């Protein structure tokens, strides 16, 4: 398990804020199983894996985007169905009164 430094990562991202956002997003994808790590796992947690990938120069923004798009679409569908159900329940209650 190699140590990852901020300086190693900053060679591949513009600033610390961008590093935090990219690493957090990638760690979330890794944790959900939306993508395989691009570096050896070595018993590291997803956040460390994400930082190691960035330090190694991998483009972590591309990996897992398809999975994220699917999750957003599913979320929208769930919201739409919930809204329809709420509207139906409200209509039923109005007709009972």
UniProtKB/Swiss-Prot annotation:
EC class name: transferase
CC per GO annotation: DNA-directed RNA polymerase complex
Pfam family, one: RNA_pol_Rpb6
Keyword Membrane assigned: no
Protein's UniProt keywords contain Transcription: yes
A biological process from GO: DNA-templated transcription
Any one GO molecular function term: DNA binding
Keywords: DNA-directed RNA polymerase, Nucleotidyltransferase, Transcription, Transferase
EC number, as in UniProt: 2.7.7.6
Swiss-Prot/TrEMBL catalytic activity: RNA(n) + a ribonucleoside 5'-triphosphate = RNA(n+1) + diphosphate
Entry similarity comment: Belongs to the RNA polymerase subunit omega family.
PANTHER family according to UniProt: DNA-DIRECTED RNA POLYMERASE SUBUNIT OMEGA
Task of the protein: Promotes RNA polymerase assembly. Latches the N- and C-terminal regions of the beta' subunit thereby facilitating its interaction with the beta and alpha subunits.
Complex formation: The RNAP catalytic core consists of 2 alpha, 1 beta, 1 beta' and 1 omega subunit. When a sigma factor is associated with the core the holoenzyme is formed, which can initiate transcription.
Name of protein: DNA-directed RNA polymerase subunit omega
Taxonomy of the source species: Bacteria, Pseudomonadati, Pseudomonadota, Gammaproteobacteria, Legionellales
């Amino acid at each position: 398990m190699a140590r990852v430094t901020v300086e190693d990562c900053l060679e591949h991202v513009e600033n610390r804020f961008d590093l935090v956002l990219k690493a957090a997003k990638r760690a979330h994808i890794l944790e959900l199983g939306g993508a395989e790590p691009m570096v050896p796992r070595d018993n590291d947690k997803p956040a460390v894996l994400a930082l190691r990938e960035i330090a190694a120069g991998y483009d972590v923004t591309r990996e897992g985007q398809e999975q994220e798009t699917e999750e957003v679409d599913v979320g929208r569908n769930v919201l739409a169905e919930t809204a329809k159900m709420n509207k139906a329940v409200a209509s039923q209650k109005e007709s009972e009164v």
